[in-house]
Amino acid sequence: MKILYISVECFPFIKTGGLGDVAYSFPKTLKKLGNDIKVFLIYSDSISEKYKEKMRSAYFFSLDLNGKSFPVEIFSLVMDDIEYLFFNDPSFKNIERTAYLDLHENSTFYLIFNKAISKFLELSAFKPEIIHANDWHTGILPLFLSGEKNENSKLKVVFTIHNLQYQGVFGASNVLKYLNEKERSNSLLSEIISNDIFNFMKAGIISSDIVTTVSETYKEEIKQPMQGMGLESVLNKYNSKLRGIINGLDYDIFNPSIDKYIEAKYDVSNYKEAKLINKIALQKELNLEQNKKIFLIGMISRLANQKGIDLVLNSLWNIVKDNDIQFVVLGTGDVNYESNLKSFGNKYPRNFKFINKFSDELSHKLYAGLDAFLIPSLFEPCGLTQLISLKYGCIPIARATGGLIDTITSYNDKQENANGFLFKEYTPEALYKSVKLAKNLFYNNKPEWNKLIYFGMDQRFGWEEIAKKYLESIYK
């Protein structure tokens, strides 16, 4: 099957969130399963020189829109048998191209990005059967492909919602002025535009053939007002084309048996001694008391409201006050959250450590050395960190939302094959209660604790299983 996969970020070129991991691992797996796939991305000056040096100019053309000419160059790089295509328009050189920007002036940039994809499809000998677009940045693309779909009835556009919070909302006039007559006459525009607002995410939902979300629970949650972010009525209307499939984990990258960053490698058959070695090594590196018996918990997170950082700040004192826990947070984000975490770390250095950066190497060491991993998200479409922590025998303590519900079987509920802890209420008290329950089990019932580790490590959330679901139930 021929597939064009479109994203604004992709590891190792540019990555600001979980989409970057998905856009690397998912196409790689589809390729391994025998599919012909290309990945369409955005060029950025921040891409490492070692990749830029391998790029070649594949296409150069101008897009003439509303009396203005936009020069477009598409670079090509082949890596691991996959061609990566990078859109570049030098007239937008000063725009910071990240997945979470939703700035007014960027409506034109993302419109040109999608127009360039449409033009590429005209020029290229590569004729995909599936176009898989991701998040709001690509939401307008199905409108531009109406002509392609008329000529090629086999062409199907799949649109994936990774995070409904970011929608690409712009003044309609700023978008419409760059559409041609055929595009402006599309009957779907009257439904997409509301109160002179053009919503790219809404456009993707309405105009694509199938809409997927990144977990079954999140699919249901976004049809409700609390998490629908204003689009719940649209999602309910188009419920028949809505699907929920969790993201996978790339075991070539996240696998304690081959992890180059950790002190002692291990798998489900020999984790006990290795995890203690990794724990002591982590404590030493972070200048914490080297104590293999203490309960060591942590977080790796973007410091944003979505991630439940306010709950953590309001629970910290209760969590560490008894001096029987070490707590580590690794992440960057909201400056107020950073400041408060730094302040707490300065007051209680014996029990709490805040590392105000992101480090891929250190994150691997945390997964291998921590006893438990905290994920107190307000909402979590899928979640990647719980999948990694499970693989590394690091017990997740998470709020019951989105993909966390779909991947964590809670010990609280006394379920068989439990692999973690879930709490329902979004309150500091509920978070603390769940941490306390986990701590008590860790200290007082090691056989039960080790069962959680075993069941977590023994589960499979690999991309091959997920890719087969897409091939069998979405793409075909």
UniProtKB/Swiss-Prot annotation:
* Reactions mediated catalytically: [(1->4)-alpha-D-glucosyl](n) + ADP-alpha-D-glucose = [(1->4)-alpha-D-glucosyl](n+1) + ADP + H(+)
Q: What class of enzyme is it?
A: transferase
A molecular function (GO) held by this record is:
alpha-1,4-glucan glucosyltransferase (ADP-glucose donor) activity
Which residues fall in a coiled-coil region? none
The EC number(s) this enzyme carries: 2.4.1.21
Q: Which Gene3D superfamilies match?
A: Glycogen Phosphorylase B
What UniProt keywords are attached to this protein's entry?
Answer: Glycogen biosynthesis, Glycosyltransferase, Transferase
What pathway is this protein said to act in by its record? Glycan biosynthesis; glycogen biosynthesis
Q: Per the UniProt entry, what is one GO biological process?
A: glycogen biosynthetic process
Q: Does the keyword Transferase apply?
A: yes
- On whether Transferase is a keyword of this UniProt record, the answer is yes
Where on this chain does ADP-alpha-D-glucose bind? 15
NCBIfam families documented for this protein: glgA
Q: What job does the chain carry out?
A: Synthesizes alpha-1,4-glucan chains using ADP-glucose.
Similarity comment: family membership:
Belongs to the glycosyltransferase 1 family. Bacterial/plant glycogen synthase subfamily.
The cross-references to HAMAP family, in alphabetical order and at most eight, read: Glycogen_synth
This protein is called Glycogen synthase
- Species of origin: Mycoplasma mobile (strain ATCC 43663 / 163K / NCTC 11711) (Mesomycoplasma mobile)
Gene name for this UniProt entry: glgA
